[in-house]
Amino acid sequence: MAFMVKSMVGGQLKNLTGSLGGGEDKGDGDKSAAEAQGMSREEYEEYQKQLVEEKMERDAQFTQRKAERATLRSHFRDKYRLPKNETDESQIQLAGGDVELPRELAKMIEEDTEEEEDKASVLGQLASLPGLDLSSLKDKAQTTLGDLKQSAEKCHIM
């Protein structure tokens, strides 16, 4: 309870005393900020430049990660024949257009494609066997299934 009263009244008191208390001009904002940090003006300017450079690097890395994710999404859209997304394409273009997937994601996609190729190749091999007639196999399977149904109908237990 005391905290709530202090936070409500304290903020108003600070505003009131701040407007009444100081008739002094702050002058140059960088100079006062540099002095408050305990640095000279040159050190403060160098510090500000470093902050800006670090922010630009973080933004570039973030944009790169967003483009990698967009590349992955567009890959799956192509794979499953889904409609394209304009925001993904714009994110890829913002990152420079030529975005590579991270190794882990590329490895996962490669494993998926290998599995699909194996499945396709096994089916392809079955169809390409010279002594195998798929239509006769289908007929035999249907007759066997029909025989099983008839024997199940004749069973007295069921």
Swiss-Prot record:
Residues 23-33 have a biased composition (Basic and acidic residues). GO terms for biological process: insulin secretion; regulation of neurotransmitter secretion; regulation of synaptic vesicle fusion to presynaptic active zone membrane; synaptic vesicle exocytosis; visual perception. InterPro entries: Synaphin. Residues 14-47 are annotated as: Disordered. It is found in: Synapse; Cell membrane. A lipid is attached at residue 155 (S-farnesyl cysteine). The keyword Transport applies. Farnesylation mediates presynaptic targeting. GO terms for molecular function: neurotransmitter transmembrane transporter activity; SNARE binding; syntaxin binding. The modification Cysteine methyl ester is found at residue 155. It is a lipid-anchor. Present in many brain regions, including hippocampus and cerebellum (at protein level). Expressed in the retina (at protein level). Expressed in retinal amacrine cells (at protein level). Expressed in retinal photoreceptor ribbon synapses. Expressed in the retinal inner nuclear layer, at bipolar cells (at protein level). Expressed in cone photoreceptor synaptic terminals (at protein level). Residues 39-74 form a coiled coil. One of its GO terms (cellular component) is presynaptic active zone membrane. Keywords: Cell membrane, Coiled coil, Exocytosis, Lipoprotein, Membrane, Methylation, Neurotransmitter transport, Prenylation, Sensory transduction, Synapse, Transport, Vision. Complexin that regulates SNARE protein complex-mediated synaptic vesicle fusion. Required for the maintenance of synaptic ultrastructure in the adult retina. Positively regulates synaptic transmission through synaptic vesicle availability and exocytosis of neurotransmitters at photoreceptor ribbon synapses in the retina. Suppresses tonic photoreceptor activity and baseline 'noise' by suppression of Ca(2+) vesicle tonic release and the facilitation of evoked synchronous and asynchronous Ca(2+) vesicle release. Belongs to the complexin/synaphin family. Binds to the SNARE core complex containing SNAP25, VAMP2 and STX1A. This is Complexin-3. It comes from Mus musculus (Mouse).
